[in-house]
A protein has these predicted regions:
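S-adenosyl-L-methionine-dependent methyltransferase catalytic core, i.e., the SAM/SAH-binding region
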Residues: 1-291
Length: 291
């Protein structure tokens, strides 16, 4: 398993993953898969398709690539419709079910780029960023039910505070949750502007943008059940990867790091993962191994 912890910019903001034009850590992550021309590979975060195109460029006629994305927007980025490539519009938590559906028992490698793409952050209609006054949606899959507005309107104060603390790592989580519950008694919070107005007084002085980004991160993770999906996908990958197969994961925050590390340790204990050491570029935390 090759896990690469992304470095941050001068403001401490993670470099955005999976932009629809320039994939993050393209060479490092695909090199980590040690592509076999006739192998079977999975890209569970297709996004703009950059990582998938690089994998396909290294596959021969006998190779296969399955690429997952639950967002319908990603389908616009498909450029290869040949027999080697299969696009699966689904959450990657269902990886094992889909591989069974396609008759695939084992894979040679899997790549996961866990960051939010600039496409989502720059789309003012999706509610992923506080830069726009837009509906509090935050669903990666627009066909799914619960939105961020639903969570803010229905969770009790304790549950909402737990979400903000666990997934946003904000010490002021209980004060923010109390303010949300108080505000929604007057009117529901339905736009990012509504949330900003309620939460801004509780942001740390000098860290307002960073704290607000963490608040939005917490809601996004809860809306999309990201931690559960990640655990399920990694467990499935451990079962699907053949001996010597590779898992290359790009993480962007400590929550993803902890899940990846925990899953890797569990796989080591079960005899599914053999740790290896590889050099990675300065500024990134190395965590490598092979199944």
């Amino acid at each position: 398993m090759k896990a690469i912890r992304q470095i941050t910019d001068e403001d401490g903001k993670p470099v955005v993953a999976g932009t629809y034009h320039v994939p993050v850590l393209l060479k490092e992550s695909v090199d980590g898969l040690a592509i076999r021309p006739d192998g079977t590979y999975v890209d569970v975060t297709f996004g703009g398709g950059g990582h998938s195109r690089e994998i396909l460029s290294r596959l021969g006629e006998g190779g296969r690539l399955f690429s997952f994305d639950q967002d319908a927007d990603a389908e616009r980025n498909i450029t290869d419709t040949g027999s080697r490539f299969t696009f699966v519009r689904s959450n990657f938590r269902y990886l094992e079910n889909w591989m069974r559906y396609y008759g695939v028992e084992h894979i040679d490698g899997l790549l996961a780029d866990l960051g939010v793409s600039s496409h989502h952050l720059d789309d003012g209609s999706r509610g992923f960023s506080f830069r726009f006054d837009s509906p509090l949606d935050m669903r990666m899959n627009k066909r799914s039910g619960t939105t961020a507005a639903d969570i803010l309107d229905s969770y009790d104060e304790a549950r909402l505070a737990d979400v903000i603390y666990m997934y946003g790592e904000l010490r002021q989580s209980r004060r923010i949750a109390a303010a949300v519950v108080k505000a929604r008694r007057e009117a529901p919070l339905v736009t990012t502007g509504d949330l900003l107005k309620v939460a801004e007084p509780f942001m740390t002085r000098g860290r307002e943008k960073k704290d607000m980004a963490r608040l939005f991160q917490a809601l996004r993770i809860e809306v999309n059940h990201e931690t559960d999906a990640l655990r399920e996908m990694l467990a499935s990958a451990a079962r699907l990867l053949r001996p010597g197969g590779r898992l290359s994961v790009i993480t962007y925050h400590s929550i993803e790091d902890r899940i990846e590390i925990g899953q890797r340790r569990g796989s080591c204990g079960a005899g599914l993962l053999r740790p290896q050491t590889h050099a990675v570029p300065s500024g990134r935390l190395p965590s490598d191994g092979a199944f």
